Amino acid sequence: MTAQTLYDKLWNSHVVREEADGTALLYIDRHLVHEVTSPQAFEGLKLAGRRLWRVDSVVSTADHNTPTDHWDQGIQDPISRQQVETLDANIKAFGALAYFPFKDKGQGIVHVMGPEQGATLPGMTVVCGDSHTSTHGAFGALAHGIGTSEVEHVMATQCLVAKKSKNMLVRVDGRLGAGITAKDVALAIIGKIGTAGGTGYAIEFGGEAIRGLSMEGRMTLCNMAIEGGARSGMVAVDDKTIEYVKGRPFAPKGEQWNQAVAYWNTLHSDDGAHFDQVVALDAADIQPQVTWGTSPEMVAEVGGKVPNPANESDPVKKAGIERALAYMGLEADTPIEQIPVDVVFIGSCTNSRIEDLREAAAVAKGRSKAGNVKQVLVVPGSGLVKAQAEAEGLDKIFVAAGFEWREPGCSMCLAMNADRLLPGERCASTSNRNFEGRQGQGGRTHLVSPAMAAAAAVAGRFVDVRRLAAG
């Protein structure tokens, strides 16, 4: 039998039909739904007189538009309120069973609450009208974002028209140094391959450093796969995967659990499986990362400098650097550690899980927000994460440091709710995109890990968190 990659196995087990040109009909196991990309899809079903093909495949929540403070006042913005209320009405009308509405204890960012509910299982195909659906590949699943018209198609047919991607292996060899996180690994990979490096590929992350990551770290890594241009990212199933899933509400029980585990243990690339491209990094070389520009590939080590466009021979790249520096208000050759910050955001589907909050709290403990920092938002990824953090006393650490402890939601990851930057404000953010205007018109975003974000909050500028940890 021909050796298969993990992606090959996941793809082949879900193909319903394949045409000669490679176009395939792919069966979808899990459909995650939120309030932003679902209204048009539900409306299309209504107009056509269709129903949800598999009600039990849909898991939904409100996240993008929900406020993260003053929940007692409801949703103030009328457009945001309309989107959330429309989701409420559509879920009721179509009889979807698994819904975590605004203020529900299980509500949260769809890519956080889905896995913690066990709605994401190894071997599944998972889709959502959201580009960071690649997060769920951390479980040995085939997961990717889809457009609004595709959301309707999956709702109506439980299938998706797709073409198979090529296979890429990104291998991180060796062990990560102290203070180096999954976010640093993700940014280092994107810095190496670029934001188009994974275009046309499904990326499997492997190597000793990846196996050493927790499930939460793997979710962070796979979340960022799309920022490297890939359709999806994934990690092979191991004992950590199975232990994470065990006992969660949507996980199999009894004999079905035993059968599932037996299958899940096959979800890894076979020896000798062919990858169309292999990229290797040495874990020992990865340092804390900070983006300086307007794309995740514009990234440097914290001990480095902002690049000088005069040193770039490619005229297109040179122009890109010049434009990014102008937007970001930075001078060439500025040391990263001399860049001050105005706002810090710790949250998003990339870095709002309990492990992320613990890392940030470890830095904040016994310290205070720097005087030049206007605001530090700490936004848990779900109601369950919030409850766990409060049970551990993390909220008290943040508040004592002058940080704001908020309710769950997408928050300042994108300017779609009340949490946003003002023009010219510079933010150390644990989110996944630093595009122009992403966090608010004229806002300047630097992507970092939770620990690095907390370090910037107390130092007032970017600083190597490992120095703070050393005392």
Curated annotation (Swiss-Prot):
Keyword Iron attributed: yes
Domain of life: Bacteria
Cofactor: [4Fe-4S] cluster
Catalytic activity from the UniProt record: (2R,3S)-3-isopropylmalate = (2S)-2-isopropylmalate
Pathway: Amino-acid biosynthesis; L-leucine biosynthesis; L-leucine from 3-methyl-2-oxobutanoate: step 2/4
Keyword Iron attributed: yes
Stored InterPro entries: 3-IsopropMal_deHydase_lsu, Acnase/IPM_dHydase_lsu_aba_1/3, Acoase/IPM_deHydtase_lsu_aba, Aconitase_4Fe-4S_BS, Aconitase_4Fe-4S_dom, IPM_dehydratase_rel_enz, IPMI_cat
Pfam family, one: Aconitase
Record-listed E.C. numbers: 4.2.1.33
GO molecular function, one term: 4 iron, 4 sulfur cluster binding
Cofactor: binding details: Binds 1 [4Fe-4S] cluster per subunit.
Residues bound to [4Fe-4S] cluster: C349, C410, C413
GO biological process, one term: L-leucine biosynthetic process
UniProt keywords, alphabetically: 4Fe-4S, Amino-acid biosynthesis, Branched-chain amino acid biosynthesis, Iron, Iron-sulfur, Leucine biosynthesis, Lyase, Metal-binding
Assembly and oligomerization: Heterodimer of LeuC and LeuD.
Family stated for the protein in its record: Belongs to the aconitase/IPM isomerase family. LeuC type 1 subfamily.
HAMAP family in the cross-refs: LeuC_type1
Protein function: Catalyzes the isomerization between 2-isopropylmalate and 3-isopropylmalate, via the formation of 2-isopropylmaleate.
Protein name listed in UniProt: 3-isopropylmalate dehydratase large subunit
Originating species: Chromobacterium violaceum (strain ATCC 12472 / DSM 30191 / JCM 1249 / CCUG 213 / NBRC 12614 / NCIMB 9131 / NCTC 9757 / MK)
